[in-house]
Amino acid sequence: MKKLIFSLLAASALFVSFAFGKSVKNEETEEPEKTSNLIKNGDFSKGKKFWDMFLSNGSADQLVTENGEMEIRIKNPGPYEYAIQPYFDGFSLYKGGVYKYSFDVHSSIDRTFEWRLQVNGRDYHAYVGGWDSVGKETKHIEATFTMREPTDFSPRLVLNVGMGKGCPEDMKGHSIFFDNFDLELVDASGITEIVTSTTTSNVNLNQLGYLPSAKKIAVVRSKKSAKISGAFEVVDTKTENVVFSGKLKNAKFNGASGEQTAIADFSKFSAEGTYKIKAGKYGESFEFKIATNIYDGILKSAVRFFYLQRCGTKVQDADFGHPECHTTRAVVYGNVETSYDVNGGWHDAGDYGRYVVPAAKAACDLMLAYDHNKNAFASENILDEIKYELDWMLKMQIPGTGAVFHKVSCREFPGEVMPQDEKDRLVLCPVSTAATADFAAAMAMASRIFKDYEESAKYSSAAKKAWEYLEKTPFDGKGFTNPILFTTGAYNDSQDADERFWALAELYKTFGDEKYLELLKAYNPVEIGQDLGWQQVGLYGLYEYLSSDAPKDSFYQKAQKAFLSKANEKLKNVAMDSYDVSLSMYEYVWGSNMGVANNGMLFLLADKISPNKKYKEAAKCQIDYLLGKNTTSYCFVTGFGTLSPILPHHRPSQVAKKPMPGMLVGGPDSKLEDPFARANLSDAPYAACYIDSV
């Protein structure tokens, strides 16, 4: 179990594919009927709710006027029509359906614009659309069309109001106004498809299953107000025989998921086999196994995922293989005459950028996993995979100064293409102290982990060189921000104290030099020890310091208290939540599954510092949550479980039209930062804010 937590954590750190999965009904089918307006808030009576705007080298504000119109106040129209693109997500177009689409528009100047209902991805082609001229008089646009293509459950309404064909060549600042959007299915007779909603369960558990000796808990839920009561049965799926039964316990309302819950505890049952839970009127669970090898497949897939993400080399795989990619030299931002070979490393998340900050976290998580359970990775070549990333990171360090470039990427995210088809110029974005400190920490750890290999010496030298740069370079008060016109991931940070602390802790643990220890003691452990994320890394530093040969003095005691306090804080969340997840109600944010995996790792590390059975059990609970014991009913790792995401935000998966297995997706985001999620989940409880859509 421990090895799996570390592996999933590493995957979540670098490769959280921020799919937003749908929390939906149980086995319902419905045929689409004639509808009222499919565009929510099409009259802007609720302000900008459900509406958003994409900018690409254009500049504009999206407002709602006192008259209830959407105003796009254009400052710079950009170089092309989609430089400014207001849009709406959250409707479906069914094959064979006849639709009527209309809206009103006027502008403060004479110009043209493009309107489209389009595919939200791939080649972004339009199902229906057109170019129209507009001026100060309000114009009514209306079109009736038949959806000829396969049903699209997540298209996008777009308005391209940048510099398009027919616009004045000297077009400058102005406003264009929209109102009264209406999309109706006026004739459903041609629709032959039956629309099936995702099948979820009211009995949720780890969909892979359990080790025979493990604690085994399923959560039974109900949206009704009455408390849950009754009994449950464990049923052998081969024989349909009841092999274990018990009473539902701990009935209560769970605030984060907004539902009544109770637990079915079948921990005493340990016979290997394939089973499901039946809970009377509440329904039954998905199938699961009890076996000694249930995690072997997912561990292998999670580790292989890193191989499939390799950049700069031929990757062999029937579905996701590709030739060499991104092999050209990268120019330095602001100094294009200078270039470096930065070939290698892993592609990040859904795009093909390579970023030092999350790379350091992912590499260190894998090294921690290996260090804590070497035998588990004997057949996985895990050190070779880690080395592939570390050797790329070495190329990101400037030889003369020891400073480290923050990232290498193209200026913009690519379309839905395989990595070899991203042909834009590679650019090394400016050095950052956060990236340099993370680099120093990773290299110092690598020097220790690879101590029996010749690579150890170069990792050691790189770590020390990076720290020398940091000693000469105080934090600039701002941190890294994307250069102008760059839209790829920023991985920014408003301070670097935790990164420096982590670097010092790793340097001290690896080399034992007292100078690192003295510098480390200048920091406040309470302020430093906040998280194991890519932005807040202080808990890594505290753990490495506490597990070093440092004297057990007053600073050590303070650091230990701070570290365990954070673990105990998360432990309280586990005790309060029906699903035993370590998140508070308000921590279901962008990438929440990374938080769950981070906390699982924190529990294991805390157990190393202060052994406690509760830490180990809590760590196992986080795995159960990620693999299906949650209110969405999803196993959040692609390719595993009965219900898992099929539409992750991951370009190779989008090209292949199937999810790459072994990815941990981002999970619920109660802030609804994805427009499609916002349009469909506006009333969903915190823990249910997940929809499986790119």
Placement of each model-derived feature along the sequence:
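Extracellular and organelle-lumenal recognition/adhesion modules and their flexible linkers in secreted
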Residues: 22-192
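Short Trp-Ser/Thr-centered turn/loop motifs at beta-strand boundaries
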Residues: 88, 129, 282-288
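Structural beta-strand segments of beta-rich domains
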Residues: 99, 201, 214-218
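Low-complexity, Pro/Ser/Thr- and charge-rich linker/hinge segments at domain boundaries
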Residues: 188-204, 213, 285-320
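Aromatic (Trp/Tyr) and acidic
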Residues: 207-281, 304, 308-364, 368-369, ...
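Carboxylate/His-rich catalytic cores and anion/metal-binding grooves
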Residues: 380-403
